[in-house]
Design a protein with these regions (language model features):
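Conserved alpha-helical segments that form or flank metal/cofactor-binding pockets of metalloenzymes
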Residues: 47-87
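All-alpha RGS (Regulator of G-protein Signaling) helical domain and cognate RGS-like helical scaffolds
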Residues: 19-25, 39-43, 100-107, 122-126
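Amphipathic alpha-helical hairpins/coiled-coils and adjacent low-complexity
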Residues: 102-105, 109-145
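Helix-loop segments that flank and shape redox-cofactor active sites
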Residues: 28-54, 113-130
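Acidic/His metal-coordination segments adjacent to aromatic residues that form catalytic metal sites
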Residues: 2-20, 78-107
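Amphipathic alpha-helical assembly/interaction segments
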Residues: 5-8, 12-15, 45-46, 64, ...
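Leu/Val/Ala/Ile-rich N-terminal alpha-helices, chiefly Sec-type signal peptides and the beginnings
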Residues: 1-30, 34-44
Length: 146
């Protein structure tokens, strides 16, 4: 196994799957962190959670904008919904209120690592809009809790 080998570029169908999963994940994380920001269980982290929730909600919109609406890709969109390597991530946030901030850190770190790896599979020309979205999301998460 060549550790320095370049991964195969994404097909259109694979891109659809990636963007569906990222949109759904961003929505799920936004909803959870938004709930945390207003439930009063951890006042010290509520402002951070509200900020992250708003950003993740916007990221979901950006990912959704990357999903082609062609009827030819309906099967790929449907199959991708609720699946993927990131599908179990929201479950990692099933923690006590006092552990919320600590739980968010590795989840966002994992998302960032996933996006960096995904960017390596995208073409600088054909996938320029997706690469731009990844760069925007990464920049937006630069000040995430660590």
């Amino acid at each position: 196994m060549d550790l320095h080998a370049t991964p195969d570029p994404l097909t259109i169908a694979e891109g659809v799957a990636e963007f569906v999963v990222l949109a759904e994940l961003s929505t799920a994380l936004s909803e959870r962190l938004g709930e945390w920001s207003t439930d009063g269980a951890d006042p010290d982290s509520s402002a951070t959670m509200a900020s992250l929730a708003a950003r993740l909600d916007e990221h979901s919109t950006w990912w959704t904008g990357r999903i082609p609406e062609s009827v030819l890709l309906e099967g790929e969109r449907t199959a991708a919904s609720g699946s993927g390597q990131l599908a179990e991530v929201p479950g990692l946030l099933d923690v006590a209120a006092s552990d919320r901030r600590a739980a968010v850190e590795p989840v966002l770190d994992r998302l960032v690592a996933y996006l960096v790896a995904l960017a390596e599979r995208l073409s600088p020309l054909g996938d320029a809009p997706a690469l731009r979205t990844i760069r925007l999301v990464l920049a937006d998460l630069e000040d995430r809790p660590r």
